[in-house]
Amino acid sequence: MGVHECPAWLWLLLSLVSLPLGLPVPGAPPRLVCDSRVLERYLLEAKEAENVTMGCSESCSLNENITVPDTKVNFYAWKRIEVGQQAVEVWQGLALLSEAVLRGQAVLANSSQPFEPLQLHMDKAISGLRSITTLLRALGAQEAISLPDAASAAPLRTITADTFCKLFRVYSNFLRGKLKLYTGEACRRGDR
């Protein structure tokens, strides 16, 4: 079996291993970054974390308010926004969400009785956010931040999370909403 005859699942596996490292996958189809299964993996992990935290009470309190991106999307308005502007909003939201998850991890580390399954999901979320950051770089989202129009962008709308459940709900909704909409459009247009 030659290199070019490898099944698609093998390319997906190689890309998932290489994506967090920012490494290219030799011989992989060039649009693998746009394969919806890659994003679906992170969506599944985020939803799983949200479900785990729904059942816990006091051990899942953050004991502070952490600022997170507002994940509400007006689909009609979103479709009218240029892809570059969408990239700015998604990149800013991802940066804020990454900070929030890291803050949540610090709160958990300082907890006297950490909820063990929560630590696993925090670690997965941090790893997933790093991989998603790499995915957005591959789509050129980071370059949109340096465009002249980025300075005139509307400020990022935010809300606060006071529980791990709300933090993971925001994470899940962000991936399912703005991130999925942006990556879908950027991949369709070929903006990489």
From Swiss-Prot:
It holds the Pfam family EPO_TPO. Residues 1-27 form the signal peptide. Disulfide bonds join 34-187, 56-60. PROSITE patterns: EPO_TPO (PS00817). One of its GO terms (molecular function) is protein kinase activator activity. Hormone involved in the regulation of erythrocyte proliferation and differentiation and the maintenance of a physiological level of circulating erythrocyte mass. Binds to EPOR leading to EPOR dimerization and JAK2 activation thereby activating specific downstream effectors, including STAT1 and STAT3. Belongs to the EPO/TPO family. This is Erythropoietin. It comes from Macaca mulatta. The lineage of its organism: Eukaryota, Metazoa, Chordata, Craniata, Vertebrata.
